[in-house]
């Protein structure tokens, strides 16, 4: 957590290397110098200016709170030799940059979750059995593991789909992998919280027996406001205790930011068009 500011944070959706759109949105918002800036993960990849985007967020210093997204972690995995570049990736310019080591270290030290003012920010989502305290405990375990000297081995062990549901009896890599996948990959789960990793359409395209993670009955984080990105097909969505921010900028749609006032009715959305930031089809 950062020092509390009197100014409500402004939360941005997935930038994914769309630097021009981010600059336009930032200039439109013209936030005061003491306004915290939250980023819901996926700062880089698929957009045309991943390096410039990452450098700009790093330059914000402690004012920027950015949680790790799946594309940010893909950058770490490629840098560590765990994964290879895929068609459509635009992170090569980061890896080739003279300040690559510093940038990778900055990304590696980002959190998986951030909690402040009764709001919990993650990249993708949460499992229904987790309350905010457990989510933060698991995020801390992941963060400490990725900041340790053997972080490459840890990161390698986190990739995989099993187990796909939470149990308090999970240990070691299995426990971390479930948390990793929920924080950075989830869209749909069963009412019991078993995750599904293939479907990426909107809620109406949920596979049989699955529903959006945030609609799981009895979700224990319903008592806090959850702020997240990741799900472009869902788009911008505001509920009293839910702020979904990924409005598909990298696919040529819009980049969104929301001023996270304590009163949900007072939250203001600002958007810019992203015609110049269209990624190739997956």
Swiss-Prot record:
Q: What does this protein do?
A: Hydrolyzes diadenosine 5',5'''-P1,P4-tetraphosphate to yield ADP.
Q: EC no.?
A: 3.6.1.41
For the protein in the UniProt heading, the enzyme class is hydrolase
> Which UniProt keywords are present, listed alphabetically?
Hydrolase
Q: Which NCBIfam families match?
A: apaH, PRK00166.1
Instruction: Provide any one GO MF term from the record.
Output: bis(5'-nucleosyl)-tetraphosphatase (symmetrical) activity
Database matches in Pfam families: Metallophos (PF00149)
Question: Which reaction is the catalytic activity of this chain?
Answer: P(1),P(4)-bis(5'-adenosyl) tetraphosphate + H2O = 2 ADP + 2 H(+)
Task: State the similarity comment.
Answer: Belongs to the Ap4A hydrolase family.
Q: Which PANTHER family match?
A: CYTOCHROME C5, PTHR40942
Q: What species was this sequence derived from? A: Burkholderia pseudomallei (strain 668)
Protein name, per record:
Bis(5'-nucleosyl)-tetraphosphatase, symmetrical
